[in-house]
Amino acid sequence: MVSDAEIKRINELVKKSREEGLTEEEKLEQKALRQKYIDAVKLSLRANLDSIRYVEDLEENKPKQ
């Protein structure tokens, strides 16, 4: 998971890149932090999607009376 400090750093780098530009080292740091954030979002989304159950599937699995 991405920490609040890492999200804050991502935002700092975005602001700095807009105002004055980034050094090569900062660009690499920004790229790594962004990728970590994207991976965390994908993982969270996958977990949410995997937990979805369709109503039709639940109805089919009920015992028939």
UniProtKB/Swiss-Prot annotation:
Pfam families: DUF896
Compartment list: Cytoplasm
Keywords: Cytoplasm
Lineage top rank: taxon: Bacteria
Major site of localization recorded for this protein: cytoplasm
GO cellular component: cytoplasm
Family under the similarity heading: Belongs to the UPF0291 family.
Protein name per UniProt: UPF0291 protein BBR47_33060
